[in-house]
């Protein structure tokens, strides 16, 4: 695993979300506040909360304590209350700043190939490695970028007519 390849994706996520969401005049499903079905607003809030409480803090736990200190459980639904009253553009700015700081921190950590094998203890999944945590960070981003795209596509479900057969994003 090459950290440069991971940071390249991590750096691009804010740009990608900005391109999709910033300044939309008609904001379909930007936040539904529903634990079962997240809109783009919910996703960006979740990503901010992850920047603050998940990826870098957990990497530090692994580097400093190994698997002797379990990770603090992550509240996957904290964004519903935390970001009420904010605009999408505010959240995008917050995410951009938090991500830039975390990518810089990740670089400053100077993680070695050997350190990627260090183990931590996830409260639900059990033993995980630092390399797995960092790879998950990237795939987590991509998963949520896809979720945002789905949230933007869904309002057009009925309007596409029979072309829906060629648009699997509408069936997820």
Predicted regions and their residues:
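Non-transmembrane alpha-helical segments in soluble domains
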Residues: 7, 18-21, 44, 48, ...
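Short acidic/polar alpha-helix capping motifs at helix-coil junctions
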Residues: 6-9, 21-23, 66-67, 83-84, ...
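Short, contiguous alpha-helical
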Residues: 27-74, 117-172
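Short amphipathic alpha-helical/adjacent loop interface patches that line ligand
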Residues: 10, 14, 99, 141
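Amphipathic, non-membrane alpha-helical segments in soluble helical-bundle scaffolds
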Residues: 3-11, 37, 41, 88-92, ...
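Acidic/histidine-rich alpha-helical segments that form the ligand environment
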Residues: 76-118, 128, 132-140, 147
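Alpha-helical bundle segments that constitute or directly flank the non-heme di-iron/ferroxidase center
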Residues: 1-28, 49-61
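N-terminal start-of-chain detector that recognizes signal peptides
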Residues: 2-4, 15-17, 32-34, 65-66, ...
């Amino acid at each position: 695993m090459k950290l440069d390849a991971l940071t390249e994706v991590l750096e691009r996520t804010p740009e990608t979300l900005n391109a999709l969401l910033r300044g939309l005049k008609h904001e379909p499903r930007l936040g539904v506040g529903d634990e079962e079905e997240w809109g783009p607003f919910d996703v960006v809030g979740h990503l901010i909360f992850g920047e603050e409480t998940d990826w870098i803090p957990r990497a530090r736990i692994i580097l400093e304590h190994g698997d002797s200190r379990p990770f603090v459980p992550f509240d996957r639904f904290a964004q519903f209350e935390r970001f009420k009253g904010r605009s999408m553009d505010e959240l995008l700015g917050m995410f951009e700043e938090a991500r830039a700081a975390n990518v810089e921190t990740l670089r400053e950590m100077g993680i070695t190939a050997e350190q990627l094998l260090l183990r931590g203890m996830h409260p639900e999944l059990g033993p995980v490695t630092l390399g797995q945590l960092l790879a998950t960070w990237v795939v987590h981003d991509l998963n949520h970028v896809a979720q945002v795209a789905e949230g933007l596509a869904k309002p057009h479900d009925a309007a596409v007519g029979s072309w829906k057969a060629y648009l699997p994003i509408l069936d997820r």
